[in-house]
Amino acid sequence: MAEERSYFGTDGIRGRVGEAPITPDFVLRLGWAAGRVLAGEGQRKVVIGKDTRLSGYMFESALEAGFAAAGVHSLMLGPMPTPAIAYLTRTLHARAGVVISASHNPHHDNGIKFFGPDGYKLDDATEEAIERLLQDGPPQMVRCEELGRATRINDAVGRYIEFCKGSVQRQIDLRGLRVVVDCAHGATYQAAPAVLAELGADVVVIGNEPDGLNINVDHGSQHPERLCQRVVEASADVGVAFDGDGDRVIMVDRYGRVIDGDGLLYIIATARVARGQVRGAVVGTQMTNLGLEVALQELGLVLERTRVGDRYVLERLLQVGGTLGGESSGHIICLDRTTTGDGLISALQVLEAMVTTGRPLDELVAGMHYYPQRLVNVPVSRGPDVIRLPAVTEAVEEAEHQLGDHGRVLLRPSGTEPLLRVMVEGADEGQVNRLADWLAVTVETAARGAATDPI
């Protein structure tokens, strides 16, 4: 049974800068504790990378000091996409990779997460061992002659650029494609434009002027409005937007319309089927649009659903022996290319499909028809308990009956807020909206100890 954790969540340790545990003294202790655990495995080398947040420099120094005190050497990568750090952990033969990032969150948040030597998330047992050391007391420094050293890897970005270029077929040439890239003022600001330009694309770049405070501000995968506008203004063929740490991507067609992770997953899967390269099921989440499931069935593929979160997508892929999975938000995992969600590599797979078929993005995604989906957030204090209330379960059964085989109902407690998320999906938009509103009222009323009549 897994131990109760004080610090590590599903995606490392994250919070607001200056508030426990995201403080310099804690991060130093974290580096020391991680170093002690990792040094015990015989390899005394880790890589450290970060996104473009101003606080990342402070935490980079704290981690380096902690690892040095534990006798572990640090290879410093500087600002790098999260998936690049996973890749370099493997190729530099490090015992672990450490990422300083809060992904798509604002600059005032930050976090720390670890990759193991294979480029996958650090295993639970190692994280639990680190937590135990954190709770044992202040760091105990090794002897001076045993202190770890820090080395700057000056060609880290170049290594990752070559890796990304190698993820598509050697003959792929993007000449003739005009691509607008939005780097969210984040970690992809160097690598993404360079990769696309070196493959021959005519690249227009926005969101590539990080100042430490503007990461994810009005740019990136969560704010595609400027990208949509720029694609149309520049008469571009396609737009690409990453989030702050580069593990998410969404794309925009030539008409300025957003293609989310579900649509991109469909395009990549279609290309893989054409080349006979699909292995196992495709993995999505509870929130994956039903339209993707139907479209994949037409390709002869099965969609496996798991909990929301890229770590759960990865776990399920490994369980079913699959190579392709992702989330609507743009976390896409191509296990035949890399070990984690990589926005740039995912975008390259889509661009490769455009080049090999000679078809624009809007035509490639046309085979998938999105089902209308409505999400309502209902304020409740105990989401899991409310879901089990008789009035709620009966209402869900009634809604599912009305939707039949052409829709879904999902009630999911928020992991961070006192909310219950009510999602209804179906072929008829009017019916979807009616049922979503009715279920939301039912949940809210039941949570107060009452019930509503069925519609």
Swiss-Prot record:
Keywords: Isomerase, Magnesium, Metal-binding, Phosphoprotein. Coiled coil: none annotated. Its cofactor is Mg(2+). One of its GO terms (molecular function) is phosphoglucosamine mutase activity. Mg(2+) binds at S103, D243, D245, D247. The modification Phosphoserine is found at S103. CDD domains: GlmM. Activated by phosphorylation. Catalyzes the conversion of glucosamine-6-phosphate to glucosamine-1-phosphate. This is Phosphoglucosamine mutase. The lineage of its organism: Bacteria, Pseudomonadati, Pseudomonadota, Gammaproteobacteria, Chromatiales. The gene is glmM.
